[in-house]
Amino acid sequence: MKKGIYLSLICIVSLQASEKLEDITLNEQAPTNTKVVKNVSGEEVKSADLADALNRKIPSISLIRRSGIANDITLRGQKRDNINITIDGAKICGACVNRMDPPTSHVVTHAIDDIEIKEGPFDVEEFGTLSGSVKVTTKKPTKKISGEMSLNGGSFGYKKASGTISGGTDKVRLLLSASTEQGEQYEDGNGDNFSEQLANYTKGNPDTAKFNYAQNHKDMDAFTKTMYMGKVFVDITDDQELKLSYTANRSDDILYPSSKMDAEYDDSDMMNLKYSVKNLSSFSKKLEMQVYQSEVDHPMSTKYRALAKKGGKYMTHHLTTDMRGAKLKNSADAFGADISYGVDTSKRNWDGKYTVTTIDGSKPIKTIGKSIADVDTDNIGIFFKGKKSFGALDIEGGLRYDDTTIDTASNQEKDTDFTSSSASLFATYKADKDTKLFAGIGKSNRVPDARELYNVKYNTKEKPAKRVINGNPSLNQTTNYELDVGVEKYFPNGQLKFKTFYSKLKDYIYYNGSLKKNNFENIDANIYGLELSGTYLATDAIYLDAGLAYKKGRKDTLTTGQSDRDLADISPLKLHASVTYDYDMQGNVQLSFVAVDKWSDIDAQNGEQELAGYGVVNLKTSREFDNGLTLLFGVDNLLDKTYTTTNTYKDLILMTDSSDTMLINEPGRYVYLNATYMF
C-alpha cells in the first residue's frame, strides 16, 4: 500500500531521486525539471479526463473547463500548441478549431502508465515545445498473464466499466484494453446543470437565447465515450524489439454549453510502430526508429439548440485532421557523456467546412464554404542532446533545427514557411548529499497552426454568406527565451523544492477579440512565476503533501486597438495540499484541499472576467483485499461549493463582438465508488 511509498521518501534523501507524484519511484537519471505522474489509471482518477487529472496533481497546470469530459489544460499560463503533447512518442492533434478535442482527450486515464511533464523550453527532441511538454506513456504488455476489471459509478449519472488483459511468452507479449463511460450533465453547487447554466446566462437576451438547448434535448446526457487499445511487443533477438499499437477513441454527443455548437461525435485512431536495436557498435548504444499516424474526425453542430428546432435546420462545422510522423534517434557514449541525436519529420493535414442540414431531410445538405482549406503543415527537424557529469555538477544541453512549410489549398491566402533554431542548457549542482541547486536557460520556437493562419468564418445573415477570415496569414512564429532557477532540499522525513522562471515571448500569438477579421496577432510578452512543493512523513502512517504555484503575465506590446496589458489565461495563486492516513497496511484515508486566489489580473478586453477565489475540500478512502479486490470511495467538493476555474473562452469560440463569455461552473458535490479486481 502507500506505506511503501512513504518509506521510499527516506531513501530519496540519500539516493537523490527525481521528484515523483503518487507512486514514488527512485530514478537518479531523471532531470530536476521533470515531474512524473504515476498511477493515473489507479485510484487517483475517477473519469477518463486526463486534463482533470493533471489539474489535480500539478499546481502549475490549470484546467480549461469546456464540458463534462474532453477538457484542456494550460501550463505556466500557456495553452494550445504552446504545449507539446505526445502519446507513446506520437503526436496527435485535435480537429476542432474551438479545442473541443484537445490532444489530452484522445487518451483515457484507464490506459495510462505514467506522464512526464517537463516545464520550459528544454525538450529539443520534439517540434514546437514552447512552454513545456507532456509525454504520456500508456500501459505495456507483460509476459505473465495478468489483468484488471473495474466498475465505477458516481453522481450525475456517471457510469464507467473498463478492463485490461495482458500476457505472452519470452518472445511475444500482448495487451488488450477497453473502457466505456457515460455521464449526465453535472450540476454545480447551485444545483444547475449545463442546460440551466446556459439558460441563466442567456436570460433576457434574445440574440443568445436561441442557443439554449431545445426542449427535447435539454436533459440529454453530457457525453458517452469508448476506448479500445491493443499492443504487441516482440523481442526479435536479445537486442532487438518491435512494438506495435493501435488505439481507437469513440465519443458521442458531447455537450459544450459555452459554445454555440456541440460535438455530434469525436472519433480518433492512432497507429504506432517502434523498432529498437541495442549495441550495434561502439557508436550506437541504442538505435530507435518510430513511425506513427493519427486521424481525428470531428463534426460539431447546432442540432441540439433551440434555433435548430425553430428554424427546422441546423449548421454543422465538420473538421478532420491527420498527423503522420517518423523519427530516427541514435544514442551513444562519447567523451564521457551520454549523447543522442536524430531526425524527425511530420506532416499534418487539417480540413473543414460548414454545411446546413434540414431536420426533416426535405432539402439536400447545403455547403456554405470551407473553414480550413485542406492545409498541410510539413516539418523536418534535426536534434542533438547530451548529458555529462563533472563531479557534483550535472550538465544537460541540446540543440535543434527545424524547417517548416505550410501550404493551403485556398487560392485567396498565401502559403508560408519557417526555419528556426532551438537550444537549451540545464545544470544541477549537488551542494551536499541533501541539497541540489539547479538552473536552466533555453530558447524554443513554435509555428502558427492552420487555424491561426487561415481559419474562415461566414456571415450567414448576408446572401450569399460573406466570407470573413478569422486567421492571419501574416503571422510570425513565436520564440520563447526562458530562465529557470531553483533549489531542492531533502530532510530525514521529507523534501522541499522551490523554483522560479522568467519567460520572454517574442511574436507571441494572441487572440484579439476586438477586430472584425484577422483576429490573431503577434505581440511581445513576458510570463514569470514561482513554484513551491514539499512532502513530509509525519509518522509511519501519516503523510503530507503540498504544492503552490504563482505566475504573472504582461504584454510588452499591445494588441491592435486595445490598452489592457494583462495576459489572458494567467490563472492566480493556486495551492494543493493533502494529508493521507494509513490506518493499516491495506487501507487509507486522504483529505485534500485546493485553494485558488481571486482572479483579478484579467484581459477584460478579450472576454476575461474577475473571478472569486475558492477553496474546495475532497475526501476519499480506499481498501485493498487479499483476493485482489480494491474498493475506493470518495467525495469531491465535499462542501458543495459553487466556483469557476476557467476564465475566457473568447479565443476558443472565435467571438469577435463585445459580449461577455459564458463561464461554466465546476461540479458540485460529487460522490463516487470504484471497484477494481486485479489478477
What name fits each language-model region?
Residues 261-282, 319-321, 371-377, 415-416, ...:
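Outer-membrane beta-barrel signature, preferentially recognizing the C-terminal barrel domain
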Residues 388-395, 404, 495, 500-505, ...:
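Gram-negative outer-membrane beta-barrel transporters
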Residues 155-182, 193-252, 267-273, 277-278, ...:
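Transmembrane beta-barrel wall of Gram-negative outer-membrane proteins
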Residues 21-50, 72, 80-83, 115:
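N-terminal periplasmic "start-of-domain" segments of outer-membrane beta-barrel proteins
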Residues 250-252, 294-299, 356, 362, ...:
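Surface-exposed extracellular loop regions of Gram-negative outer-membrane beta-barrel proteins
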Residues 225, 239-286, 295-321:
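Flexible loop and strand-edge segments within Gram-negative outer membrane beta-barrel domains
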